[in-house]
Amino acid sequence: MKRLFTAAALVALFAAAAFAGVQDFGKFTVDVPEGWTATADGETVGIVKNDNTASASITVSETEGSSLKEIADAFVQALGGKNLAADNGAYTFEFTNQNGVDSKAVLSGDDKNYALIIMTGVENAPDDFGKIINSLTEK
């Protein structure tokens, strides 16, 4: 299996966490932490901490001929993002969601597929976010 994300981009930010187990979402698998709930909706999977203090959404889709940079630019524009940066083959940016909460995004992929992870409440569960990102595996 191929990793969707290069761990080097985010390893320094996160440590280990306890996990409930690997869940299969069609195009990818991910370890969902204990105390979190995952729900699929089309190409997007939402993973929410049960106390609602943190969440992640993971979207895996086809690039349809666009470069990762073009896709990153489109998401930054659509979400009102800022601080777009390239990091080890991935792109990161920040934005404020519709509820006024600051969110962070990581976009990575290859010529065929991309994965976008949007994280909200990172400060409330940094270890869990690190494991979610590092466990994401394309099928």
Place the predicted regions along the sequence by residue.
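N-terminal "mature-domain start" segment
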Residues: 21-41, 87, 136
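Short N-terminal leader segment in a subset of presequences, especially plant chloroplast
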Residues: 11-12, 28-33, 58
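Extracytoplasmic/secreted proteins, especially bacterial periplasmic and envelope-associated proteins
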Residues: 27, 31, 70, 74, ...
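Conserved polar/disulfide-associated segments of primarily extracytoplasmic proteins
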Residues: 40-126
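Sec-dependent N-terminal signal peptides
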Residues: 1-15
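Surface-exposed amphipathic alpha-helical segments
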Residues: 36, 117-139
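Alpha-helix C-terminal capping segments
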Residues: 23-25, 74-80, 137
